[in-house]
């Protein structure tokens, strides 16, 4: 019986006439070719076989193609091919290794059943007996080992063609997820108790565990593979798949019909639609709308092409999100703060230039020149008044003043020359500043060159002016003190004149005091103007840089023109020599020390004064002037 069963079994590759390395396309083409040759009708006519034999050969061909066309079944068949070919289906109730495990490989073939009945060799009878034997073996092993009865779940019944589909689903779900409770101790390779030492026994135990695990995994895979094999050929499952496919096709057809109907209705509504009058747009508006859309598209394209760029940090950004994150960064905020501070400093400097603006214009230079000339005229008038007052008081002392004027004439002329030189430099410097400002506005990007000569002249001029102001302030205090003394003694003392008229002497005294007060006011205004002017020069001296060599040539030519201009003005004016210069005080004192009588003591009354000015005022008021012998 066993030999006959083995002779009936053939390898699937042999049935299809292909090799084990054949591709799915080769398997398909071979099956189609053999299906035409081994059709039952052709076999009965050509070979003269019976209908049963012809049908059996054709079913063998179909079964081989079904197994090898499925990648999973083909892989499982390749790994268990020898066991399937040499297994005996009659040992299903028996066992291997002491009857513990039933032999299931013999049932991976359609030859074990005939028809789908639940009796005899029917499909449901044969496979029910196989799965029932597996379940009973699990119960027996659990009882032998003393395991709990709930460790083995109850298996659903396979049923027949009349069973509900829920029972079919439950049956296959149970066996597709099967897991045995057997430990497969009979597959041990080594006898652990016969080990010579502890280490060897431990190694034997490890090898036996691996063998048991492998046998258990193979048994579970065999049972699950058999369940999948049976499900694929179960007529109930096949009929349910056909039914489900028919329902799916029906639903798809209904969905297509519904969509067609909806599309048809939509087209009908669109054809019957009439636009109301208020919704009709004029052609011009449509064109305008089209142009606006094109402009919007162009703007969008420009925005895409535009790159986000941070001017402060000199960085480019690909997205607006990166740009916003950069604006919130600490480095960006610090650089923005620095830039804002630099802008603020620049604005403050511009405001300072605007405050000093009138000094930089040509009109301001002319006004400055006129004002300086007026100051010179006022100084000349003041000196004339002083000369008249002193001349009237010291008429008897002409020889004394003539000798003193001869000794001081040279120093006074030198002081006047120094003062005119400073005046020329000041006027020239003002015009040079105006041209520097204009050239700076026109050529902002050219190289800045510092004019050391002008800076040196301005610094020298400032030093001389500051020294002169200190001396003028000291003389002004002396004049104020002398003026107060003169005001107190005016009503008591008469200045002797040529005619000896007291009224004329009083008028001369009053005119002298008025001229002295006016000169003091003018000197105060002049000092305030000089202070403001020197402050503006110091503020602009930091920025007094020329732009190019042409600016230097223009400065030199303008300086020469200004010098000629000042000389012409000086020649047109009738300057009178002052009897005593403000800046000649040092020279006068130096020359005075060479005289025999260097003390400030009155020869007549013997009173000593702090300065020669007070001594002269005392001589003028008291008439104690005497003629000195040569």
Swiss-Prot record:
User: Where do the coiled-coil regions begin and end?
Assistant: none
Pfam families found in the cross-reference section: DnaJ (PF00226), zf-C2H2_jaz (PF12171), ZUO1-like_ZHD (PF21884)
State if Zinc is listed as a keyword. Answer: yes
Positions of the zinc fingers (C2H2-type)? 308-332, 600-624
Q: Which GO terms describe its molecular function?
A: nucleic acid binding; zinc ion binding
Q: Which residues form the J domain?
A: 11-81
Judging by the UniProt lineage, the source's domain of life is Eukaryota
Task: Give me the Gene Ontology terms describing cellular component.
Answer: nucleus
Sorted keywords for this record are: Metal-binding, Nucleus, Repeat, Zinc, Zinc-finger
Lipid metabolism found in the keyword field: no
Which Gene3D superfamilies does this entry report, sorted A to Z? Answer: Classic Zinc Finger (3.30.160.60), DnaJ domain (1.10.287.110)
Instruction: List the biased-composition ranges (Acidic residues).
Output: 284-299, 344-357, 391-420, 441-460
Basic and acidic residues compositional bias, start-end: 247-283, 319-328, 469-479, 519-533, 546-559, 568-577
Q: What is this protein called?
A: DNAJ protein JJJ1 homolog
């Amino acid at each position: 019986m066993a030999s006959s069963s083995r002779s009936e079994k053939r390898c699937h590759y042999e049935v299809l006439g292909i090799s084990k390395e054949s591709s799915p396309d080769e398997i398909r083409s071979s099956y189609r070719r053999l299906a035409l040759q081994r059709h039952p009708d052709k076999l009965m006519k050509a070979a003269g076989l019976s209908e049963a034999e012809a049908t059996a050969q054709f079913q063998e061909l179909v079964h081989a193609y079904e197994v090898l066309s499925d990648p999973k079944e083909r892989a499982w068949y390749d790994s268990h091919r020898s066991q399937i070919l040499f297994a005996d289906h009659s040992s299903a109730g028996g066992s291997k290794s002491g009857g513990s495990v039933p032999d299931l490989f013999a049932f991976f073939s359609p030859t074990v059943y005939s028809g789908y009945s639940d009796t005899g060799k029917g499909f449901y009878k044969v496979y029910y007996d196989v799965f029932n034997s597996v379940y009973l073996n699990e119960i027996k092993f659990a009882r032998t080992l003393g395991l709990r009865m709930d460790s083995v779940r109850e298996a659903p019944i396979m049923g027949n063609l009349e069973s509900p589909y829920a029972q079919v689903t439950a049956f296959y779900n149970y066996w597709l997820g099967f897991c045995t409770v057997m430990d497969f101790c009979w597959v041990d390779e080594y006898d652990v108790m016969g080990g010579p030492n502890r280490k060897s026994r431990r190694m034997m135990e490890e090898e036996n565990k691996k063998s048991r695990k492998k046998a258990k995994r193979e048994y579970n895979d065999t049972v699950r593979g058999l369940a999948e094999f049976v499900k694929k050929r179960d007529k109930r499952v096949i009929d349910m798949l056909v039914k489900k496919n028919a329902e799916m096709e029906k639903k798809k057809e209904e969905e297509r019909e519904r969509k067609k109907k909806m599309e048809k209705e939509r087209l009908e509504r669109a054809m019957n639609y009439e636009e109301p009058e208020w919704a009709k747009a004029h052609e011009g508006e449509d064109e305008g709308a089209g142009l606006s859309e094109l402009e919007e598209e162009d703007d969008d394209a420009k925005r895409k092409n535009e790159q986000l760029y941070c001017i402060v940090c000199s960085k480019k950004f690909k997205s607006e999100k990166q740009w916003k994150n950069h604006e919130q960064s600490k480095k960006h905020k610090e650089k923005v703060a620095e830039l804002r501070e630099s802008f603020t400093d620049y604005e403050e400097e511009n405001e300072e230039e605007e405050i000093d603006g009138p000094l930089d214009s040509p009109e301001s230079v002319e006004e400055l020149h006129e004002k300086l000339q007026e100051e010179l005229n006022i100084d000349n008038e003041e000196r004339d008044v002083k000369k008249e007052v002193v001349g009237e008081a010291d008429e008897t002392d002409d020889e004394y003043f003539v000798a003193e004027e001869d000794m001081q004439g040279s120093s006074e002329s030198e002081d006047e020359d120094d003062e005119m030189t400073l005046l020329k430099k000041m006027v020239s410097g003002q015009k040079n500043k105006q041209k520097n400002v204009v050239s700076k506005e026109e050529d902002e990007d050219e190289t800045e060159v510092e004019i050391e000569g002008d800076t040196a002249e301005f610094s020298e001029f400032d030093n001389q002016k500051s020294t002169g102001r200190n001396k003028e302030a000291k003389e002004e205090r002396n004049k104020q003190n002398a003026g107060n003394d003169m005001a107190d003694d005016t009503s008591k003392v008469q200045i002797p004149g040529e005619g000896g008229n007291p009224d004329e002497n009083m008028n001369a005294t009053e005119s002298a005091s008025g001229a002295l007060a006016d000169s003091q006011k003018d000197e105060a205004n002049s000092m305030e103007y000089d202070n403001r002017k020197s402050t503006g020069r110091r503020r602009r001296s930091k920025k007094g840089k020329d732009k190019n060599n042409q600016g230097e040539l223009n400065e030199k030519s303008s300086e020469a023109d200004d010098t000629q201009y000042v000389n012409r003005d000086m020649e047109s004016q009738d300057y009178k020599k002052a009897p005593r210069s403000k800046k000649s005080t040092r020279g006068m004192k130096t020359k005075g020390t060479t005289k025999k009588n260097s003390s400030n003591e009155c020869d007549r009354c013997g009173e000593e004064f702090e300065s020669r000015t007070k001594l002269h005022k005392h001589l003028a008021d008291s008439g104690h002037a005497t003629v000195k012998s040569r």
